[in-house]
Every structure is written in C-alpha cells, then in structure tokens.
A protein has these predicted regions:
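Transmembrane helices with small-residue packing motifs
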Residues: 10-47
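Residue-level detector of functional hotspots within protein domains
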Residues: 4, 17, 28, 53-55, ...
Length: 169
C-alpha cells in the first residue's frame, strides 16, 4: 500500500522526507556528546550506590581513582606545587606502590604523581579539570603526561565532539 502510494507520488514523498530531515538536522547543535558518571547511570539506588554517596560525603571524590601525572623526578616538586594550586585538586604526592615500604618507583628518571581530585573521578567536573592539570604540569615539565580515568574520559569526550562536528554536518 505504501509502496504503491510512493510510486504514484514520488515527488510528494521526496519533499515530505526532505522536510523531516531538515527539521531533524536543525536540532543537531543540541546534541550533547558528554557522558554520565557511574553514579548517574543507575535508575534505582542499589546499596553500592548508597555506600558510594556516603563515602563522597566524607572523603575526596577522586580518592579511589587518582589522576596520574608522569613527570621527570627532578621536576616533580615543582609540578606538585603547580598542580596543588588548582582548586579542584585535593592532594598530590608521588605514587607509592607499597605503604609498608614507602619507596617512590623511578623508571628512566620519571616518576608518577597521584593527584586526588575533590570530585568523583568519573564525573564531568573531573573531566573539566584535566586541561588545567595538563597545563599546570606542562608549564613545569614540558614532557609531563596526565592520565587516569578522568583524563581518559576527557579525551574520549574531546574525540566524540570532534567526530560529531566533523562527521554529522
């Protein structure tokens, strides 16, 4: 039935389809290419979510998944000072593998700094801190690299926005 109607009036269907597509294209700028945090992904409140919310009330949000910064050992103190000045950073210190034996692991003159954020590591607020952390670290050590879950999510968001703006239009 639809096929016969389309065959009899192809121009009418082409015009209507074009109008519908144009209306849909008009809303592309409202497309949000940002993710949601793990806590926002639940439709109900399981006990693990309640426990996580309680932890967030008493401890820095990024404590369980710190942002990691790879820096030259000789520039680490200056990087620590630069990153400490960022309002969303709760603390920063060299990564220690074993609390019983607190030795900073050094590989090829580089060490890892753990920056604990005040907000949950998977939140959009944490993702927004990454460019500032990178800028602060690179202002001291041009070869500094910033990683961790927040940096990964930030980079995925940047790539998704780039692809959306390149491919969709």
């Amino acid at each position: 039935k639809v096929a016969n109607s389309t065959a009899r009036n192809p121009r009418k269907y082409a015009i209507v389809t074009s109008i519908i597509l144009l209306v849909m294209v008009a809303f592309i700028p409202t497309l949000k290419a940002t993710g949601i945090s793990t806590l926002e992904g639940f439709t109900k409140k399981p006990k693990s979510l309640i426990g996580q919310e309680l932890l967030l009330q008493h401890f820095p949000g990024g404590q369980s998944q710190p942002t990691q910064i790879l820096v030259s050992k000789d520039k680490s103190e200056a990087v620590i000072a630069a990153v400490k000045g960022i309002s969303g950073v709760s603390s920063i210190a060299p990564e220690i593998q074993d609390p019983a034996n607190p030795v900073v692991k050094e590989v090829n003159g580089k060490i890892v700094l753990d920056a604990t954020l005040k907000v949950p590591a998977d939140s959009s607020a944490a993702r927004e801190l990454i460019p500032e952390i990178r800028k602060a670290a690179k202002s001291v050590d041009n070869e500094a690299l910033v990683g961790g879950i927040s940096a990964t999510f930030h980079d995925v968001d940047v790539a998704a926005r780039h692809d959306r703006n390149l491919i969709i239009p």
